């Protein structure tokens, strides 16, 4: 099944699921950043976590 891009708060999310998580973070009054960083893994692949929650210094992949 192909992900459906979804816009929320002027951000185009790659999927509806990611947008729903953003809505949940807002409901919980958690500051969040969407796809803030890109990391290079040991096998030289790029990895971009979906969210960063600054309050907890936490990256989240949904």
What are these language model-derived features?
Residues 28-43, 50:
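A short acidic/basic microdomain associated with nuclease active sites
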């Amino acid at each position: 099944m192909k992900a459906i891009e979804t816009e929320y708060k002027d951000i185009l999310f790659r999927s509806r699921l990611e947008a729903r998580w953003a809505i949940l973070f807002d409901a919980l009054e958690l500051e969040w950043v969407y796809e803030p960083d890109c990391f290079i893994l040991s096998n030289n692949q790029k990895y971009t976590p979906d969210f960063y929650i600054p309050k907890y210094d936490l990256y989240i992949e949904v």
